[in-house]
Amino acid sequence: MSKSFVLHSAFRPSGDQPEAIRRLEEGLEDGLAHQTLLGVTGSGKTFTIANVIADLQRPTMVLAPNKTLAAQLYGEMKEFFPENAVEYFVSYYDYYQPEAYVPSSDTFIEKDASVNEHIEQMRLSATKALLERRDVVVVASVSAIYGLGDPDLYLKMMLHLTVGMLIDQRAILRRLAELQYTRNDQAFQRGTFRVRGEVIDVFPAESDDIALRIELFDEEVERLSLFDPLTGHVESTVPRYTIYPKTHYVTPRERIVQAMEEIKLELAERRKVLLANNKLLEEQRLTQRTQFDLEMMNELGYCSGIENYSRFLSGRGPGEPPPTLFDYLPADGLLVIDESHVTVPQIGGMYRGDRARKETLVEYGFRLPSALDNRPMKFEEFEALAPQTIYVSATPGAYELDKSGGEVVDQVVRPTGLLDPIIEVRPVATQVDDLLSEIRLRTAINERVLVTTLTKRMAEDLTEYLEEHGERVRYLHSDIDTVERMEIIRDLRLGEFDVLVGINLLREGLDMPEVSLVAILDADKEGFLRSERSLIQTIGRAARNINGKAILYGDKITPSMAKAIGETERRREKQQRYNEEHGIVPQGLNKKVVDILQLGQGLAKTKAKGRGKAKAVEPAGLSAVEMTPKALQQKIHELEGQMMQHAQNLEFEEAAQIRDQLHQLRELFIAAS
């Protein structure tokens, strides 16, 4: 199944990239556990990492600090490695309210969640790829450190089928039910199977557009074929096939029975403790809830909130780390932590918040103490489990520098020849009027401006002031969710408005080549918003424009300002030297705006499989890119209905066309959520 990594790119490594690639590869081959790549904005860090992956041929996990950046990286990696398995592993919840108890008001909040089926399918596809092949790049968010089904149990539960195998129909159906597939002879969808005489059709949970047909004859597997579930068109026949469980959390029956006995023992011990402390209500509540869960597990093999019993189901001891995506990564895997100065602290913070909530549930009799072991990994456990790691950041944190022994691989020179922004320090007294005149200079030549303030009040007042003076301005604040934020960024790039005002403004992440000026108000007020790292990241937002400039308004130069200015000057000088030596003329980036919400061109190009007559599909992405996630979801439901109608009328050409449109819309929906 495994192929070799093949890197597809119109460019060759240039600037600092060849040296960075060589040093990273040498470090990995010498067995260095930690390396840091200091790559400035626009220097092609992702391309460098893609080259390292292609040269070393090792399965890789890329950790991003949020879904937005993960989607962007996934799109880029998909374009670099179209022939290999590039997978996406982020939280599959569109909405998630964990169960919680508020003692002060005696309020119990039930767990409530809405699962995005398409992302769930992509998660299952990611683990399947890691188990089956080596040419895998998984782009993940911090969701990767949360508990996942045990890989050993997951492997045990698989159903292996080969042509000529002796197995009767009922045994296959029983095994499919154990894998949590449901029988549905009418609506054939992901995670279901249907039976027609001696033919069983299975729609694998990790598949998006291919189903399996099992044809039996006299208790023998006569033929295995892969077909298009919409049109019924057989794509190919295969000698063997492995059906993976519908969820990561499936458990063999004998393990469930054993777990139930262990849960009963813990319940008996916990009841004694609660009764000894005269907590009668809590004891009664815990007994009732646990007995109900045990009954459900006995009858169905699972229950609502079964993850709270994960310690027993995976057979781990008290306090042991939960199985996570890292358990699926091969021992010689590679870990790349993007924007490490943000991602590393996130990994450390997840465990504490989760524990505080669960301790209250345990104390008041809503959960057994073992529920505390259904948790994200602690930071120390992550460190112990992480394979060889490359930290990637324009501003590495103290942790990464310490782990790398102070050795940093520099990638300061940009292949495009673009220089770091020119930095000017100007007095605070006239900052608003000075800013207004600078904005007018930029808007006259169709360039954009970012302004970062220290307080919400200041941001609101400044927005109002600029509006009164006829500027097209928007204000970005913490109440705006990820999707709306991406829409605002897209509108800024498209020129719907010219000035974006915010507080902790867009430091790590999305590229905005149209921004030529970054103005930092009150830059001389020391604090986390004006630290060296924050200043460098904010200044970097103007580094993709040929006329990039950063203005720091302050009456004195603080140590953080001095370091940020010094570091930017160092990078600027190094780039200038390189440009002169190689006769490079800096070129501005011209990045399509549509790219923000799409997950790489590779995803949009769906093939019309085996149907030569299929008409060219209208690119759903172009008009759909304007839509909000809610509108996208509505459009998806609408098209699904039309597709089924065409399929029932045997109009397979039209149904297939709509299916291809749905592919594109779903990718846009993932990026937007």
Curated annotation (Swiss-Prot):
- Helicase ATP-binding domain residues are 26-183
- Tell me where in this chain the UVR domain is found: 633-668
Recorded GO CC terms: cytoplasm; excinuclease repair complex
Q: Which GO terms describe its molecular function?
A: ATP binding; ATP hydrolysis activity; DNA binding; excinuclease ABC activity; helicase activity
Pfam families reported in the protein's UniProt record: Helicase_C, ResIII, UVR, UvrB, UvrB_inter
Subcellular location field: Cytoplasm
Domain Helicase C-terminal stretches: 431-597
Instruction: State the InterPro entries in the record.
Output: Helicase/UvrB_N, Helicase_ATP-bd, Helicase_C-like, P-loop_NTPase, UVR_dom, UVR_dom_sf, UvrB, UvrB_inter
Q: What is known of its domains?
A: The beta-hairpin motif is involved in DNA binding.
Q: How does it assemble?
A: Forms a heterotetramer with UvrA during the search for lesions. Interacts with UvrC in an incision complex.
Q: What exactly does this protein do?
A: The UvrABC repair system catalyzes the recognition and processing of DNA lesions. A damage recognition complex composed of 2 UvrA and 2 UvrB subunits scans DNA for abnormalities. Upon binding of the UvrA(2)B(2) complex to a putative damaged site, the DNA wraps around one UvrB monomer. DNA wrap is dependent on ATP binding by UvrB and probably causes local melting of the DNA helix, facilitating insertion of UvrB beta-hairpin between the DNA strands. Then UvrB probes one DNA strand for the presence of a lesion.
Per the record, the similarity remark reads: Belongs to the UvrB family.
* Protein name according to UniProt: UvrABC system protein B
